[in-house]
Amino acid sequence: MAIRFFKPTTPGRRHGSVLNFDDLSSKKPEKKLTRGWSRAQGRNNKGRITTRHRGGGHKRLYREIDFIRNKIGTSAIVKSIEYDPNRTARIALVCYKDGEKRYILSPTGLKVGEMVIASPNAPITVGNTLPLYNIPLGTSVHNVELQPGAGGQLVRSAGSVAQIVAKEGQWATLHLPSGEYRLIPQKCWATVGRVGNLDNSNITLGKAGRSRWLSQRPHVRGSAMNPVDHPHGGGEGKAPIGRARPVSLWGKPALGVKTRKRKKFSNNLIINL
């Protein structure tokens, strides 16, 4: 998928770029697989802000994605490749032999008219889903389960890919996009291939308005606030923060401080090379 640039008629056009949508199918979303979606706007059930810098954004319909791929042994044909405003990856509409339609993540190289299947004995081709114990070493995978039958939770964003590097006992070692090597049960399922829309990370928004369309509000520095609003606030002009180290809005150490729980269970499943 190529990136489009525009004539610099405005500053936003000059600095911005967009993805080329020519390879997408020109059809409306499947009505039975979409539903209305109300934004949380970064608030919890009490209406209090739990995630700052969220709010606004363009109205969307949510597409229900099949991350579990639990129609075992039934092949499906790819009917269309579509845009999904709720994720960076593209989605593919597949139709099974019994007539059921589902959305799946569209991997790189998947084309309309091709067949995909979820089966322990499926061929190692792009879009097929298998348990890890039947996928050869060195294979690129995405939409990886953490627990058998729970549905894919890892490696789902545009252009991301994991690689199976080892198998021993009931565990498979995967090299994740973060660089982490993690043990995953071999009974977990994964989809062969790399998530599509590789150029997503190369686009430039170009103007503040495009961030607002995506529900991203301005991220204001603490040093630009008043003392009542942030521990870094106040002072005459561009004053230093006046502390030994940076802190968050609530006075907790920030910037370079580890936030992961030291006794978290999954620490045993992460391999430190």
Curated annotation (Swiss-Prot):
Residues 30-55, 222-243 are annotated as: Disordered. The keyword Plastid applies. GO terms for molecular function: RNA binding; structural constituent of ribosome; transferase activity. It comes from the Eukaryota. Residues 45-55 have a biased composition (Basic residues). It is found in: Plastid. SMART domains: Ribosomal_L2, Ribosomal_L2_C. InterPro entries: NA-bd_OB-fold, Rib_uL2_dom2, Ribosomal_uL2, Ribosomal_uL2_bac/org-type, Ribosomal_uL2_C, Ribosomal_uL2_CS, Ribosomal_uL2_dom3, Ribosomal_uL2_RNA-bd_dom. Coiled coil: none annotated. Its main location: plastid. One of its GO terms (cellular component) is plastid. One of its GO terms (biological process) is mitochondrial translation. Part of the 50S ribosomal subunit. Belongs to the universal ribosomal protein uL2 family. This is Large ribosomal subunit protein uL2c.
